[in-house]
């Protein structure tokens, strides 16, 4: 479903940061200021947001993987919820340096987590002493928190979706190094450099974050549904061709 400018206004997408913290590279997307707060031009944001969603739909239709990244307190739950709804990986606790650029090391940790989860399923905890079980549970909880959202990622994602590029500078830098496209919400206090699909907007409001993340998740589901429909139509077309030539 298409997002309207009214929805963006209601979610507070247009509220930037205090004028003294601004980044001049965001000047083209700023409408003005009110009470020393920059106001983002939603007439710029809306089409750029729609361009980002169009790219997301195409990527999802081609079975691409989009990694959701949002580790700030006000975005953690929404990022996990919407990524799971879209069947995509996510990072919502802390970005571990090398998550993309040193994926081999991450794979070792993912294997450890999966082995530990399998051990729990098999009832191995009951065979341990109380102390061993406690240490085991602590380790598995730590791994689930830090890499649970990426345990089924399988490889480098085809794109990353980031809320707050300043807070997730390392994630953006790693994606840039590997040539992984970056879709990101950029507030008035950060630079849009290194971002392929810029969404100028408030990156602090939980309502605004929910609007962005829901839109991206919806676009992924739409892209996949469209791809399935195209396959069904193609199969039907082939069947009709066979019947006509029978």
UniProtKB/Swiss-Prot annotation:
Q: Name one GO biological process term.
A: translation
Q: Which PROSITE patterns match?
A: RIBOSOMAL_S2_1 (PS00962)
Tell me which domain of life the UniProt entry assigns to the organism this sequence originates from.
Bacteria
Provide the coiled-coil residue spans: none
Record has Ribosomal protein as a keyword: yes
Alphabetic keyword roster: Ribonucleoprotein, Ribosomal protein
SUPFAM superfamilies xrefs: Ribosomal protein S2 (SSF52313)
**The family this protein is said to belong to:** Belongs to the universal ribosomal protein uS2 family.
Recorded protein name is: Small ribosomal subunit protein uS2
Gene source species: Burkholderia mallei (strain ATCC 23344)
């Amino acid at each position: 479903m298409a997002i309207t400018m009214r929805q963006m206004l209601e979610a507070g997408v247009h509220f930037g940061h205090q004028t003294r913290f601004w980044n001049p590279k965001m000047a083209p997307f700023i409408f003005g200021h009110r009470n020393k707060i920059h106001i983002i031009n939603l007439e710029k944001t809306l089409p750029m947001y729609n361009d980002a969603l169009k790219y997301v739909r195409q990527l999802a239709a081609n079975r691409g993987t989009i990694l959701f990244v949002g580790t700030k307190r006000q975005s953690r739950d929404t990022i996990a919820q919407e990524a799971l709804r879209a069947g995509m990986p996510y990072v919502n606790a802390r970005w571990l340096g090398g998550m993309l650029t040193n994926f081999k090391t991450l794979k070792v940790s993912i294997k450890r987590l999966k082995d530990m989860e399998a051990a729990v399923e098999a009832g191995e905890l009951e065979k341990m002493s109380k102390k061993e079980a406690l240490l085991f549970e602590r380790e598995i909880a730590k791994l689930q928190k830090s890499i649970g959202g990426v345990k089924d990622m399988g490889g480098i994602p085809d794109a990353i979706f980031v809320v707050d590029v300043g807070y997730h500078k390392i994630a953006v830098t790693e994606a840039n190094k590997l040539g992984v496209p970056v879709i990101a919400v950029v507030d008035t206090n950060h630079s849009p450099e290194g971002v392929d699909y810029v969404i100028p907007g408030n990156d602090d409001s939980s309502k605004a974050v929910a609007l962005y993340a829901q839109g991206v998740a919806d676009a992924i589901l739409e892209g996949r549904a469209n791809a399935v429909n195209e396959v069904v139509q193609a199969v039907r077309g082939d069947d009709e061709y066979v019947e006509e030539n029978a």
